[in-house]
From Swiss-Prot:
Role, per record: Part of the ABC transporter complex PstSACB involved in phosphate import. Responsible for energy coupling to the transport system.
Protein name: Phosphate import ATP-binding protein PstB
PROSITE patterns: ABC_TRANSPORTER_1, ABC_TRANSPORTER_2, PSTB
Gene name for this UniProt entry: pstB
Topology relative to the membrane: Peripheral membrane protein
GO terms under biological process: phosphate ion transmembrane transport
EC assignment: 7.3.2.1
Amino acid sequence: MNNEQLITNVKPKKEPLKTAIEIKDFNFFYNKGKTQSLFNINMEIKEKSITTFIGPSGCGKTTLLKSINRLNDLIDGVKMSGAIKIFDKDIFASDIDITKLRTEVGMVFQKPNPFPISIYDNVVYGLRSLGIKDKAILDQICEESLIKAALWDEVKDILNSPALGLSGGQQQRLCIARAIAMKPKILLMDEPTSALDPIATLKVEELVLDLKKDYTIVMVTHSLQQATRISDYTAYFLKGELIEFNKTKKIFTNPKDRRTENYISGRYE
C-alpha cells in the first residue's frame, strides 16, 4: 500500500463536542433562603445534544431548567449559590446582559403559549422587541424559523391568521419557531408535549431530534419512554439532588444507583 492509499484510508477524527452548559456546586433556595430545592448540583451538558431531566414531581427538574436562563430571578425571595456557565460565560456575573442571555437560551413551556396575535407576528415578536423593523429581514427569519419548526407548509398561506386558531400541536411548534427566530444557542423545554395528543407529541419529538444538529436541547419530561426515544443523555433527580447523569442508554439499561433503577422500573414510592 502506497502513501497515497494510506492517506485516503485515514478517517478524520471527530472534533470533541464543546461543553455548552456547566453547572457547578449549584444550590437553589426559595422563601428568602429558608427552603432549599436544589442541593450541590454538578453537571456538564455537551453542545448539539439532547439531555432530558427525569424524576418525580417536585424533585427540582424545572427549577434547574429555569435557572439556566435565569427565569427564576422573576420569583421573589429566591437565592442561589454556585455557578452556571454557558459556553464558559458565568451567567451570574455582574456584567451579564440578561436580555441577551435569554435570547441565546430560548425557552419552550409546558403549555403552548402563543400570543393572541397573528402567526407571523408571533414568530417575529422577539425580533421586533430588539428593534428589527426591516420587513424583508423579518419575512426571511419568519420563513426560516417556521421551516425549522416543521410548520411552514401548514401555515404559509395563513400567516396573518390568529395563532390561537391553530391546533395544540401546531401552537407548540409555533412557540418553538418563535424561540428559534431569536437564533439561540440553547433551547430549554419544560415538558413540551405533556398537553399534546400522541400524534402531535410524535411530531414535536421528530422536530426536536432534527433541531439537535443546530442547537443544544435540555428537556424536562415525565415520560420515561420519551427520554429513551429522543435523548442522548439523561439526568435523574430526586428530592433536589442529582442522583445520576449519564448517557441515556446506560441510565436505562445499567443504572449505577439503586434509586435510579427503582424509578425507571416503576418502584419509586
